[in-house]
Amino acid sequence: APNVDDQSLLHTGDWPFGRTNHYFFDLNRDFFLLTQPETRGRVALINTWRPQIMIDGHEMGSQSTFLMGPPRQPLNTNIDTDLQKWAVTFSEEQGAAFDKRSWRYFTGEWFENWYPGYSNYSEYRGSMHILYEQSRMAEDGVRRPEGTVQTYMESVHHQFVSTMANLESLATHSQAMYRDYWDGRKYNVSAKSKFADKSYVILANDNHGRMAALVERLDAPVSYTHLTLPTKVT
């Protein structure tokens, strides 16, 4: 018989498994730290392919409904305002797909966009990041407080419709998004950018292997100096 009680073992994950690698490290916190081999592989693909959008489809507590963007404050100030604008557009069009089917959802509430170690790392490379979370149903579905049973098939349908809505939005707005991307990248390397004429100094210590590993992971132009240079600490 189906077990729709979300307190049962069927609906309970085996801690700490589920979202960690075999080192028990949460890979959805590692995107800019790059401590894990899986993360370094993901980031290398993002930096190589530079996708226009990156979708992160999650699950959450079974007694919730469906979370979609845009995120709430605080927002990281290093994220381009154009990406924030498009996040609102995509969310509204995804929400319209849910409204059409009378599905419950909420937006702009509990998840913020400050920490760059989530999959939203893609936004710092110019790609729009989309997160949504479906209440977890497992195999048999879950009885909700009002007495209805939401099935696993319904939860998959929500994720599928969300993805298709995002792809339809991308097809509609792709050219305008490319123009914003080009303008933003061009500005960021211009003399007017807040990043213009800036260098970052890392003081070396006796652990040369650790320094070499950091340089490799940064994948950025690096030079070494043995001179004493004046610096301004900010």
Residue ranges and their predicted role:
Residues R143-Y187:
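Catalytic cores of secreted or luminal carbohydrate-active enzymes
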